Amino acid sequence: MTDTRYDALQQLGRESRMPDSPEAAVLERVAAPSRGKNYVVRFTCPEFTSLCPITGQPDFAHVVIDYIPDSWIVESKSLKLYLGSFRNHGAFHEACTLMIAERLVDLLAPRWLRIGAYWYPRGGIPIDVFWQTGAPPEGAYLPDQGVPPYRGRG
């Protein structure tokens, strides 16, 4: 059975190659199934990668995105390809994290969004970057992001 509401999607159900850059990646959205309810959608990307803009060395992060939809939800295959497009993108941790959050906010206009990017150590120092659009709506169930602080071998 084909649902014509999804015919405009360019990637879901089709062979898609990894975009060359985040700017070239196409993020897609579909209508939210339940408007007016404070339900949280969570995406976890435990193997996010990008490149240091200075050295070109790989950086790795565990990224958790939580949002409360309004009219739209992100199509998950397009999000997977978007996040994968950072693999050859050179930017500092903070820039990558905020670029992801801002692109999703622009696309979805969610009721609320937060991102936690838990970057693995480079030079012995882990960098964690957090951002959210504001206070979450009252009554929303927001589980902890579930990523323990980095401890190394200790």
Swiss-Prot record:
EC number(s) from the headed UniProt entry: 1.7.1.13
One GO molecular function term? preQ1 synthase activity
Q: Which residues bind substrate?
A: V74, E75, S76, H93, E94
Reactions catalysed, semicolon-separated, are: 7-aminomethyl-7-carbaguanine + 2 NADP(+) = 7-cyano-7-deazaguanine + 2 NADPH + 3 H(+)
Please name the top-level EC class of this enzyme: oxidoreductase
Q: Which GO terms describe its biological process?
A: queuosine biosynthetic process; tRNA modification
According to its UniProt record, where is this protein located? Cytoplasm
> One Pfam family this chain carries?
QueF
Superkingdom per UniProt = Bacteria
Query: One Gene Ontology cellular component annotation?
Result: cytoplasm
Cite the entry's keywords alphabetically. Cytoplasm, NADP, Oxidoreductase, Queuosine biosynthesis
Q: In which pathway does it act?
A: tRNA modification; tRNA-queuosine biosynthesis
- Where does the record place the catalytic residues? C52, D59
Classify the main location.
Answer: cytoplasm
* Function according to Swiss-Prot or TrEMBL: Catalyzes the NADPH-dependent reduction of 7-cyano-7-deazaguanine (preQ0) to 7-aminomethyl-7-deazaguanine (preQ1).
Q: Which family does it belong to?
A: Belongs to the GTP cyclohydrolase I family. QueF type 1 subfamily.
Protein name per the record: NADPH-dependent 7-cyano-7-deazaguanine reductase
Q: What is the lineage of its organism?
A: Bacteria, Pseudomonadati, Pseudomonadota, Alphaproteobacteria, Acetobacterales
